[in-house]
């Protein structure tokens, strides 16, 4: 998958055409889901693809923002065994499926839900796993202009490049407000990120979707170590924060592995004290 191009053109869709996904494309999405990368390899995941008539009426009132279910021709139900970091893994896996669908011209959207047991009961699922995600899939009613010609990491960034990338991330926090260097609050500038080949990975991670578009992630660069912290606030719950963290890790990893090196996220806190505020929690780190 071309993560750079796919992320640049991805956006959540909540209004779908009454049109099923063609069989060839649906099979490609299902095949990808069976073998897609995981954040934690030894967590067993089961992904059920179900159609409108098997899901919408059953979950209306029980899933979706304030119980208003999103109408879509298809849904992916993510089930997972319960292990350490299984929710972050669900965010990573589920968003990977969304990106693959987008690459194939299929739109998607994460759907909120309150309780795994209720979803399992309403959908009559036979499983020993927990529902960790619901994703709508289909063709969006509104077309969106495609962005092409993403800039490669390590190149010389012109003013036109910067404007193009800035426009693609409109509505997002400025990168320097999201990436710190050496210590918390010390903003990383574009030149430093570019020299370290980290501008693109950070910029694309900045575009990751998040609950209520909170953009809760902050990255701290300490030499070759990248630390990811996520803000805890009253507007969201722990599940949403962990899903958001998993998605951000996927975006960063997808870009940096295409342009610089392979990485391995180490989940959990770090030993060193960086002066991180108490409302932020370190969720992972990696070496580049």
Predicted regions and their residues:
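Acidic, surface-exposed loops and disordered segments
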Residues: 1-288
């Amino acid at each position: 998958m071309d993560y750079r191009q796919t992320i640049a053109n991805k956006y959540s869709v909540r209004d779908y055409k009454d049109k099923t996904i063609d069989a060839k494309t649906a099979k490609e999405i299902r095949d990808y889901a069976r073998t897609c990368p995981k954040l934690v390899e030894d967590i067993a995941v089961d992904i059920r693809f179900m159609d409108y008539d098997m899901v919408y009426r059953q979950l209306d009132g029980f899933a979706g923002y304030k119980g208003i279910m999103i109408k879509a021709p298809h849904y992916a139900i993510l089930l997972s065994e319960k292990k350490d970091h299984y929710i972050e893994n669900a965010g990573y896996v589920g968003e990977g499926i969304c990106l693959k669908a987008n690459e194939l011209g299929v739109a998607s959207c994460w759907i909120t839900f309150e309780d795994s047991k209720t979803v399992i009961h309403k959908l009559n699922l036979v499983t020993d796993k927990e529902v960790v995600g619901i994703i709508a899939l289909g063709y969006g009613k509104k077309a969106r202009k495609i962005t092409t010609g993403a800039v490669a990491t390590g190149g010389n960034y012109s003013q036109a490049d910067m404007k193009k990338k800035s426009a693609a991330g409109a509505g997002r926090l400025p990168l320097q407000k999201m990436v710190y260097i050496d210590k918390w609050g010390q903003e990383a500038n574009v030149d430093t990120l570019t020299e370290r080949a980290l501008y693109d990975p950070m910029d694309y991670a900045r575009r990751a979707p998040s609950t209520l578009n909170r953009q809760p992630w902050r990255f701290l660069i300490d030499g070759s170590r990248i630390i990811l912290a996520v803000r805890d606030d009253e507007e969201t719950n722990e599940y949403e924060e962990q899903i958001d963290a998993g998605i951000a890790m996927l975006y960063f990893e997808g870009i940096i592995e295409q342009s610089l090196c392979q990485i391995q996220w180490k989940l959990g806190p770090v030993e060193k004290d960086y002066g991180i505020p108490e409302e932020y929690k370190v969720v992972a780190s990696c070496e580049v």
